Amino acid sequence: MDKKMIFKELTELHDEYCKDCFIKKQFRKEFGKTYAHSFCINKCTVGEKLKQYGDVLTNH
């Protein structure tokens, strides 16, 4: 997979699932930005997928 395709996939995933995510908004309101961000990266399945793409880009 080339960089252009990875960036396209990242953008689509973010726009479709993360942009208006209720859980992220709620956690940000209750626990703060850092907690919400940590949850998204470490526990959310979409965040895990985004992280995998990021790893591919850094090792590319």
UniProtKB/Swiss-Prot annotation:
InterPro entries: DUF2602 (IPR019718). This is Uncharacterized protein YpeQ. It comes from Bacillus subtilis (strain 168). The gene is ypeQ.
